[in-house]
Amino acid sequence: MRVLFLIYLILSPFGAEARTLLENHEGLNVGSGYGRGANLPPPSPASSPPSKEVSNSVSPTRTDEKTSENTELVMTTIAQGENINQLFSFPTSADNYYQLASFKKLFISYLLPVSYVWNLIGSSSFDHDLVDIFDSKSDERYWNRKPLSPPSPKPADGQRPLHSY
């Protein structure tokens, strides 16, 4: 449940910005009526000057640039691993410490290039012999091994060996 809340918390500013862009671009009131046009007066004849409402509207290009800059700033900050607590407010109790650490790893790992992550794994200190999935020799040894035979019975002192007929 917390994960869904965090996803909603991250994506909600982008949804509000998209709604504002849509309202400014099409003159719609998206918040009420789910995209249906607001009750606007009928269009004026072509000879009349444009209304003040249209001429005072914010340019979509300026808003797009602002949104792009904000998105780049957030992505850069997360990718650089800077203090993510300043971007998102998290409780700082001991119970949530591990959740916060895994949250940071999740976002940073999705933003890093695959080659960097692969090199990071390759340079770590775990035993590669146990984990090496590309080792074809171990596959050959597994599939070409001989089945184990049961141990041969040894006669006890003073007894004859049993012979099967």
Swiss-Prot record:
Residues 19-35, 54-143, 162-165 form a propeptide. The keyword Mitochondrion does not apply. The modification 4-hydroxyproline is found at residues 42-43, 45, 49-50, 150-151, 153. Keywords: Glycoprotein, Hormone, Hydroxylation, Plant defense, Secreted, Signal. Residues 33-70, 142-165 are annotated as: Disordered. Expressed in leaves. It is found in: Secreted. One of its GO terms (cellular component) is extracellular region. Activates a lipid-based signal transduction pathway in which linolenic acid is converted to jasmonic acid, a potent activator of defense gene transcription, including proteinase inhibitors. This is Hydroxyproline-rich systemin A. It comes from Nicotiana tabacum. The lineage of its organism: Eukaryota, Viridiplantae, Streptophyta, Embryophyta, Tracheophyta.
